[in-house]
A protein has these predicted regions:
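N-terminal active-site beta-alpha-beta segment that forms phosphate/nucleotide-binding
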Residues: 1-87
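Surface-exposed, charge/polar-rich loops and edge strands
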Residues: 50, 62-95, 99-116, 122-190
Length: 190
């Protein structure tokens, strides 16, 4: 799928070269109650720097992926891993999310995102909001989709990108041609 999605390599390298903290997805079996969560969940784990990023092996889609044997050596944004680290007091500033398609809802003013169907990002955002939502001074995470311009549908034929009650609307979407589409509705505090 690398040729069918926006590549994040330059974004990751630039952020790391500027000294930013960069977290990438790590999928794993969950220890959470199976009645309240999927069998596998996504956490965000920190990259240690450019050399660490370059050492990551690529998965079957060509995406650099964390070796499960190194997860306990890494900071996890939600904490609570096997190493028992606490979450950051501040949390994440921005999350870039993939999607199959995006559009604009004329009624609500939201950008709608059609994910890949597993709910990994939506469930992570829900867990993140529970962990950070009541922290004093916490600024809600900005959620932006990342897409090719062809993935942003203008007046889709069937009228709408399908979304469910658990789908988190992004604040906007950044397109491969440099265009940024913003939601105009106030998204509830996460």
């Amino acid at each position: 799928m690398p040729e069918g999605e926006i590549q994040t390599d330059a974004i990751v390298r630039d952020a790391l070269s500027r000294g930013k903290s960069v977290y990438i997805p790590f999928l794993h079996k969950t220890h959470l109650d199976p009645k309240e969560s999927p069998a596998r969940v996504m956490d965000m784990v920190q990259l240690k720097g450019i050399a660490d990023y370059e050492s990551l092996k690529r998965d079957k889609w060509g995406i650099p992926s964390i070796d499960p044997s190194t997860v306990n050596e890494r900071h996890r944004i939600l904490g609570g891993g096997v190493d028992g680290t606490a979450p950051d007091a501040i949390g994440l500033d921005l999350m870039l999310m993939p999607g199959v398609a995006f559009d604009y809802d004329e009624v609500t003013g939201h950008i709608r995102r059609l994910g890949h169907g597993k709910g990994f990002y939506d469930f992570f955002i829900t867990r993140y909001a529970r962990r950070y939502g009541n922290n004093p001074g916490h600024i809600p995470i900005l959620l932006y989709g990342l897409a090719l311009k062809e993935q942003f549908l203008v007046a889709p034929e069937d009228d709408t990108i399908p979304v469910g009650p658990l789908d988190e609307p992004p604040h906007g979407v950044i397109l491969g041609d440099g265009t940024i589409k913003h939601t105009i509705a106030k998204i509830s505090e996460r």
